[in-house]
C-alpha cells in the first residue's frame, strides 16, 4: 500500500493528540505527584466504581488507536470516518485527566461529556457510513472506537456517580444502594443497543461486562456486589446472541456480529 498524504494536517494532528492522550494516561496511572488524584485510583469514588485493574483496558484501546494513526496514512477511510473528531475527543480527554487530578471533579465531568460526544460521533458515523471491508479496517478502525465508545460511556456514568453519590465512611445509605443498583442496571441495559443496533457490536458489549465484573470485585456491599455479578453474567451471555443466531441458521444482516 502506498502512503496517502491527502488530509495530512488532520493525520499529523491525530498523531500529536494520540501521543498527548497516551502520555496523560500513563502519567495518571504510573507517575505524578502522590498528592494528585488519578481517575484510575481515585480518591473520588462511588458505589459503582470498578476495581483498578479494569482500567487496564486503556492499554488495549491505546494499542489499537496507535495502529489507527499509522493505518490512516494508507487509506482515506480513517479521515472519512474520523475527520477532526479524534482530535477533539483526545483534547477533551486530556483536559478531563488534568481537571480530575487537580480536584475539579465537576469541570472534569463536563470535559468528559464533550469527549464522549466526539467519540460517539465517530462511532455512529462508522456504523452508518462504513463497512469493514478488510481485517485491517476491523482491527484499526472499527474495533478501537467500539472499545473507546463503550469505555468512555462507562467512565462518564461512574464519574457522575462519584460526584453526586460518593463513598461514605459509614457505608452506603439505602438510597445510595438503590441508586447504585439503578446505575448498574442502566449501564447493563445499553448492551441491547450494542448488540441490536445495525450489525451488532460484540466488542463494545464485552466492555460493559468487563466493567460490571470490575464492580463486583471492588464493591463489598452485598446488594451491589451480587447485582454487579449477575448483570455482568447477563451482559456476557447476551453478547453470545449473534453467534447463537448464526449457529442455528437464523442469522440476518441486522444481527451479524462485528467486532468493532
Question: What does each model-identified segment do?
Answer:
Residues 43-57, 138-145, 169-172:
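Short aromatic-rich membrane-water interface segments that cap or initiate transmembrane helices
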Residues 16-23, 85-97, 111-123, 141-159, ...:
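Alpha-helical transmembrane segments of multi-pass integral membrane proteins
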Residues 250-260:
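Non-transmembrane, juxtamembrane loop and terminal tail segments
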Residues 5, 49-54, 171-189, 213-240, ...:
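Membrane-interface transmembrane-helix boundary segments in multi-pass integral membrane proteins
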Residues 18-35:
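Alpha-helical transmembrane segments of multi-pass membrane proteins
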Residues 97-110, 167-172, 193-198, 219-222:
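Membrane-interface helix caps and helix-loop-helix hairpins in membrane proteins
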Residues 63-109, 113-135:
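Internal transmembrane alpha-helix with an interfacial aromatic "cap," most often the third helix
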Residues 2-15, 58:
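N-terminal membrane topogenic signal
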